[in-house]
Amino acid sequence: ALVLPAKYIGGFMMVVRAFIGQLTLHLCEPRALPEVPEGLDFVSMTPAQFIALQEAGKPLKVKTLLLGGSALASRFDSASYQGVYLGYGMTETASHVALRPLGSPIYTAVGSTGFSVNTDECLCISAPHLGIAQLQTQDRVRLLDKKRFHYEGRLDHVINSGGIKLHPEKFESVCDAHSIQAVMSAKGHERYGQVPVMVLRTMDDV
């Protein structure tokens, strides 16, 4: 089922998967609390949508559920959710290149994907089936072997809020141009993974 906007990579990849696999794609209105038919084989959605369904008492009855785009709150990251996986990927990889089942901290490569790390212990991705060779990320990991890793966090200051990446430096520079001192950081959020928090101080007399 397609429950994400098709104009963004997460939703568009569902269209691609259905086309390549000659699968029947059920179209659902993309919203925070999606209406998903029962008995489907595969659904992809954001952690925020998954949490909204759980809190509304509407557990999904599908074979496989793929979550991606942002972090998942720890209280929902449980092995009790059978058939639910968190995907690891980015726009540059077009789709997920690794998966981990809920309740496990270990991501495992998809297909011919292989992993290594650079001198900053950041993940490097090689995926021949996607035409990717040594794509360097800003994600720090503990590499277990060429196919598995444990995600440990970002090297940079990017804030991932519900799948939207925010760069604090850009917001801070705009404020600086208006004589406002600003510092932006991230605060953990159960539904969106992170939310931005900004402290402002004017440099002019009030």
Describe these PLM feature segments.
Residues A1, E55-S104:
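Gly/Ser/Thr-rich phosphate-binding loop
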Residues A1-A52:
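AMP-binding/adenylate-forming
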Residues D41-F42, K63, D139:
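Conserved acidic residues
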Residues F42-S44, L66, V199:
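Structural motif
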Residues G114-R142, R148, R201:
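AMP-binding/adenylate-forming core of the ANL superfamily
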Residues Q138-V206:
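AMP-binding/adenylate-forming catalytic core of the ANL superfamily
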